[in-house]
Amino acid sequence: MASSACFLLHHAPSTPATTSRTPSHRLVPTIKPSQLICRAQKSSDTDENSSTAVSRRLALTILIGSAAVGTKIAPANAAYGEAANVFGKAKTNTDFLPYTGDGFNLLIPAKWNPSKEVEFPGQVLRYEDNFDVTSNVSVTVTPTSKKSITDYGTPEEFLSTVDYLLGKQAYSGKTASEGGFDPDSVATANILEVSTPVVGGKQYYNISVLTRTADGDEGGKHHVISATVTDGKLYICKAQAGDKRWFKGAKKFVESTTTSFNVA
């Protein structure tokens, strides 16, 4: 680091070199102006080292600031009851496991176990809840002469041809009209929701049904059915849960499982 020093120089008066003088002329000295001279001086090594250290610290500060501005920080979002994702990494959904069958795919709740029980004709898959077998999912594949699911008619008409999917009650016989059931009837089914999406060029029927039986202790069962036709086969995925568990979280697993059902 350089510094400057200034010096003020004074010049002595000067007189003409001639020796001839006349009495009528007075000697007037010639005065030159003072000069201010500034000379650059090199500071000591200590100043240089201090300057170098300051420069390095300044460069490092600028570098860190630039890196912070240029870095994209993902928000640490978290839902209630979940840990914050402080590093911005994508979280893996561990609630479901992918399953690939013969010509179809779906997601199955991770805590459900495979079951050997065969409940429906053409059943190729069954998983059930570890703690409540009422909550389960099954896939059936049966031959059909239909070219499309729409050949069965409306979703309601299709459901009437596969009403065995809704289960059977333990009692049958003459009954009085009570508990909301018709006379001589111990079971009832109500269609709650119907949709007809097209996925991968294939028409699907998605039907949500609530059934109640006189011998049931769950207050009813929620059934969600997804069905389609391809290559001369009728594919049906049905998941269900008891009414009590439905409102305690089972709804998420039942609906997500049937929604994920996809036929190749």
UniProtKB/Swiss-Prot annotation:
Keywords on this record? Chloroplast, Membrane, Photosynthesis, Photosystem II, Plastid, Thylakoid, Transit peptide
Q: Name one GO biological process term.
A: photosynthesis
Report the subcellular localization.
Plastid, Chloroplast thylakoid membrane
What would be one Pfam family of this protein?
Answer: PsbP
Where is the transit peptide, renumbered to this chain?
A: 1-78
Report the GO terms under cellular component: chloroplast thylakoid membrane; extrinsic component of membrane; photosystem II oxygen evolving complex
- Tell me which InterPro entries the record gives: Mog1/PsbP_a/b/a-sand (IPR016123), PsbP_C (IPR002683)
- This protein's major location comes to plastid
Q: Name one GO molecular function term.
A: calcium ion binding
Q: What Gene3D superfamilies does UniProt report for this protein, alphabetically?
A: Mog1/PsbP, alpha/beta/alpha sandwich
- What family is this protein classified in? Belongs to the PsbP family.
Q: What does this protein do?
A: May be involved in the regulation of photosystem II.
- Name listed for the protein in its UniProt record: Oxygen-evolving enhancer protein 2, chloroplastic
Protein species of origin: Fritillaria agrestis
Q: What is the lineage of its organism?
A: Eukaryota, Viridiplantae, Streptophyta, Embryophyta, Tracheophyta
